[in-house]
Amino acid sequence: MADSEKNSCSCSFCGKIHSEVRKLIAGPSVFICNECIDLCSGILQEEGRSYKKTDTLDLKPKEIKKVLDEYVIGQEHSKKVLSVAVYNHYKRLSNSGVISEVEISKSNVLLIGPTGSGKTLLARTLARVLQVPFAMADATTLTEAGYVGEDVENILLKLLQAANFNVDAAQRGIIYIDEVDKISRKSENTSITRDVSGEGVQQALLKVIEGTVSSVPPQGGRKHPHQEFIQINTDNILFIFGGAFDGLDKIIESRHRGSSMGFEANVQKVSKNKDIFCYTEPEDLVKFGLIPEFVGRIPVITSLSELNESTLCRILVEPKNSLVKQYKKLFEMDNIDLQFDDSALSEIAKKAAVRKTGARGLRAILEALLLDLMFESPGDVGINQVVISKKMVEELMVNSRLFLKH
């Protein structure tokens, strides 16, 4: 090839001519340079490292829980239940190619607990521990096909995006759907009319969680005939659902009262138990408004208790990525040593307990508490240490809009 002809050829991807690269490889009407080949190779290797093929799970239930303990404080029973469910799920995958007379069903999980009790954090941490793609959705935004709103397939698209469109990795991922209690039917009886935000969504989810091959539009949005689709098999995707289920406690109490046969002590024991959701049975969820088929596809049910002041105080400092550690790091970047008195931490936890917003309320309080300091201290060479005391917490919070309603 003559020099003039070489220089007229350029890489079809980056546009560089032959003299600007070490090698230019020709194909039918296209060229690619060695630099673009190296770049593509790096991308493929990175995707291969991002998500291992989780056909086998090296971690045992105790080891899974141990990692969860590093990030999630309290909720011991729920962490144990989740660890076993996840272990069994991926053990099922590792034997999926083995011919067996016994077909093992998926261990989809339902987490019942108040706002801020750690439902989302548990699901997200599990995905991180297992190194699998993770997607999250809000059940209240979903509608069945044909209605205005978000299709169930869009959740699968989020999972694909989290997996860098690696279909094999996505098919072994975890999907967390929050606020599932908000899509309950208005009554236990089947309605003649369609319930767009209730039973219809449950029916749409049912097909996906029990296992099907879904056609997912790569650009999202509604499906149309001229669009290309990505086929994703949901058989091996683990679904975790979460919800506060306000009013379910009354249903549980009513069931115990009806079956107690005069043993009032048993009813009183259930009624006074703060963790009444631990008595949840599938029939209670059906009475609440979830359809029987949907409940039947979620064999593992566990409850999370409301976080008390003591647990909230531990959450501030103990997790690997605790809020106190995060804010200390932020101040450290400005060469400022941030310290908290124990009494200050107790007061912050007390404020969060009053708000009843759980762990997520802690960040709002800390943000309000440290706002002025984060505004004033950067660039002030006279400040090299800040110590937060109980008195500062009380004084700074007196006029805070965050607490005016309390």
Swiss-Prot record:
It comes from Ehrlichia canis (strain Jake). Zn(2+) binds at residues 11, 14, 33, 36. It comes from the Bacteria. It holds the Pfam family AAA_2. GO terms for molecular function: ATP binding; ATP hydrolysis activity; ATP-dependent protein folding chaperone; protein dimerization activity; unfolded protein binding; zinc ion binding. Component of the ClpX-ClpP complex. Forms a hexameric ring that, in the presence of ATP, binds to fourteen ClpP subunits assembled into a disk-like structure with a central cavity, resembling the structure of eukaryotic proteasomes. This is ATP-dependent Clp protease ATP-binding subunit ClpX. The keyword Ubl conjugation does not apply. ATP binds at residues 114-121.
